[in-house]
Amino acid sequence: SLNKCIETKEDFSQELIAKLYESGEAGIPVETFFPKEEIKGNNYYILKNGSNSVLACYDPVRKVVRKVEKLNTFGIYPKNSEQAFALDALMNPNISLVALSGKAGTGKTLLALAAALQQNKAFEQIYLARPIVALSNKDLGYLPGDVNEKVSPYMQPLFDNLAVIKH
């Protein structure tokens, strides 16, 4: 879960926050930020000092801490730091699996679909899946109607998200 990879650091060095803004995507060597801490790859940070803050990520490939930009994908903008981190992880070709968890309606599916469609040339297929738990573990075969009538209401939230992305 991405939430387990997010850490807020209060009273962080104002100088390092400024350097991170200046460095952009290039980043700053991890030892500069966390000299005595062992950190895991692709951890995300909210670094704060008073009213100043920056969203950051540890890139284990380049061994730098870099500023996380609020990406725009198909006109979809992150509304908060968690969505910015999620979209950053979803768009990072060095991260092969991203697990997003959270309450319904927080944008997980929309961000995942937008990121997948943005990168569609990198993949042969995009699979949309939903957990069967939402059906109270009922077998679809026992529901009345043909396969489209059975699956359509269940898949409608995915189609709704695709419609938002399309327009």
Predicted regions and their residues:
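Hydrophobic anchor at the beta1->P-loop junction of P-loop NTPases
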Residues: 100-102, 112
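Short acidic (Asp/Glu) and glycine-rich catalytic loops that position anionic groups and cofactors
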Residues: 65-70, 94, 132-141
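Conserved glycine(s) of the Walker
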Residues: 105-107
